[in-house]
């Protein structure tokens, strides 16, 4: 026999577990798209020496990443996985030997997703803009240096 309070406790526990998983899934999705957009910007800098497009892509990706990342409590493991997903997708796009229609569609889809995420999290981003800009400038400079050295 399940008492009413046990049932409610189990329901609450299951809801908590599922909601935490959905937070992680959304963060993973945004991390993946941030990597795709950063990879696109990096390829623009490498192939076309278009620093403005690189800067814009990087800024959009970082703001969406931190906007989503700061919106819920995250474990160190969640953050580590999200950063790995981001880095993997930067490499995936940056190292593309040729752009197929599928790659192009993925890049466009990710720009849209990140644009919407920045709009959705705009207040959170504004409230944390100093911290976000520190990371933005630090990592943008590092990636530019790596691209220009290669």
Label for each model-derived stretch:
Residues 61-150:
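Compact alpha-helical subdomains of small soluble proteins
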Residues 8, 12, 19, 46-49, ...:
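Compositionally biased amphipathic helical and low-complexity segments enriched in hydrophobic
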Residues 7-9, 14, 56, 66, ...:
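Terminal low-complexity, poorly structured segments
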